[in-house]
Amino acid sequence: MISNSQLDLGISFVGSGSATPQKIIKNDQLGQRVDTNDEWIQTRTGIGQRRVIGENESLIDLATDAAVNAVKMADWDVQTIDLIILATSTPEDLFGSAPKIQSNLGASNAVAFDLTAACSGFLFALVTASQYLASGSMKRALVIGADQLSKWVDWDDRKTCVLFGDGAGAVALESSGDESGLIGYDLKSDGSKGGCLNLSQSNVFLDLVQGANHQKGEYLPIKMEGKEVYKFAVKEVPIILGEILEKCQIKSESIDWLLLHQANQRILDAVASRFSIPSEKVLSNLKYYGNTSAATIPLMLDEAVRDKRIKSGDLIACSGFGAGLSWGAALFYWHGPY
């Protein structure tokens, strides 16, 4: 566990960006492949469609576009970016995709690396970047969440194929000294329950030389115990958010927006109900994108900023949760130009 009480970290959220693939797959289209339909999916998940990366697109393209949009909103010169963290579980290059984004941006002065924490990845990356900025060693950081789970979905598994989509989102963080954006956070993991949701390596071994073999480099499709993940989320997310609010001495009625990982509308509604947060303060775009893993939070944040729902000075309670099992939460003020 890593956490803080209310601290003036002097870190501002000054820009956001997002990007999604062009190809849309609607619920009824999935019903042509597996035994499901639009009503069944929407009733149980809130998802109406999802977007998937096609032949002329890539995860790095989406992540770069999201980063460019965040940099433009922040009005930064790319040469002043010190750090780029890409939160992803589906890199195009297992040795690291963030440096390719750095190159695409022309941010030659930035350190760039990947971070993996599944659907909690964006929050883990956010806290990691904030630590660098709070130390004084860096001033500006891009935090990107991007995933392409469509390539790891078993499209004949009704339990999982209806849930996931592809996308990217980014935020620009700045060490401001006197204006605190991030005021509280907490991160947690429980590996004992990791089997509830995983994308594991295959257990296939091939002969190498006499007396020795090697494991084949391939992964199995996503496996999920939906009921267990739901119970985990509706139990742990309210606890971790409640602890942060208590530490920061902020009442739930002071929250302007509840921004949760976009996994299932029932989870969003259950958490909001625990804090008596009205539905109009709960941010959701599940209907249009489904679960885009590490991208859901920054993608939703950017949409709400650009359509003027989120305004400068708004207080946002945020939580991510997913495979690992891992979960986290953050409380921050938005200080962007919109």
Swiss-Prot record:
The last Arg residue of the ACP-binding site is essential for the weak association between ACP/AcpP and FabH. Residues 262-266 are annotated as: ACP-binding. Belongs to the thiolase-like superfamily. FabH family. HAMAP family: FabH (MF_01815). One of its GO terms (cellular component) is cytoplasm. SUPFAM superfamilies: Thiolase-like. It is found in: Cytoplasm. One of its GO terms (molecular function) is 3-oxoacyl-[acyl-carrier-protein] synthase activity. Transmembrane segments: none annotated. GO terms for biological process: fatty acid biosynthetic process. Homodimer. It comes from Prochlorococcus marinus (strain NATL2A). This is Beta-ketoacyl-[acyl-carrier-protein] synthase III. Its EC number is 2.3.1.180. Keywords: Acyltransferase, Cytoplasm, Fatty acid biosynthesis, Fatty acid metabolism, Lipid biosynthesis, Lipid metabolism, Multifunctional enzyme, Transferase. InterPro entries: ACP_syn_III_C, ACP_syn_III_N, FabH, Thiolase-like. It is an enzyme of class 2 (transferase). The gene is fabH. Catalyzes the condensation reaction of fatty acid synthesis by the addition to an acyl acceptor of two carbons from malonyl-ACP. Catalyzes the first condensation reaction which initiates fatty acid synthesis and may therefore play a role in governing the total rate of fatty acid production. Possesses both acetoacetyl-ACP synthase and acetyl transacylase activities. Its substrate specificity determines the biosynthesis of branched-chain and/or straight-chain of fatty acids. Pathway: Lipid metabolism; fatty acid biosynthesis. Its main location: cytoplasm. The active site is at residues 119, 261, 291. It catalyses: malonyl-[ACP] + acetyl-CoA + H(+) = 3-oxobutanoyl-[ACP] + CO2 + CoA.
